[in-house]
Amino acid sequence: MLLIITNEEDIHPNPVIDQLVKLNVPFFRLNTESLLSHYDITYAISNASHSFTIKYKDGSHAISSHDISSVWERRPIEPLTTFDDLAPNVSKLVLEEGDGFLRYFRYSLTHVPW
């Protein structure tokens, strides 16, 4: 499965996605700014291995680390928080954790073509 890492405002992946749909090529689009608001992430780490699953909160799409055959990264941006009721220091921590996850996430995919 192709993992497309981008942002919601980037329209350039859309024609590619249209072709992927026509050709029945499985893909998952990850809009990085929405990481903290639109996705559920499950991550498991042990001494022997690691794995993750990312799902749209609406349940429409999901991807597992075991499913990824290649990655296309195009214009990702830092995660944004939509949790307005958080204290500023907590909001800062949440954003740092989201950004840290994206960095480790990329590193965990070095075994597949980019």
Which residues are covered by each model-predicted region?
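Extreme N-terminal starter segment of soluble prokaryotic enzymes
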Residues: 1-3
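Conserved N-proximal alpha/beta basic substrate-recognition cap immediately N-terminal to
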Residues: 7-19, 30-114
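Short phosphate-binding/catalytic loops that engage adenosine nucleotides
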Residues: 25
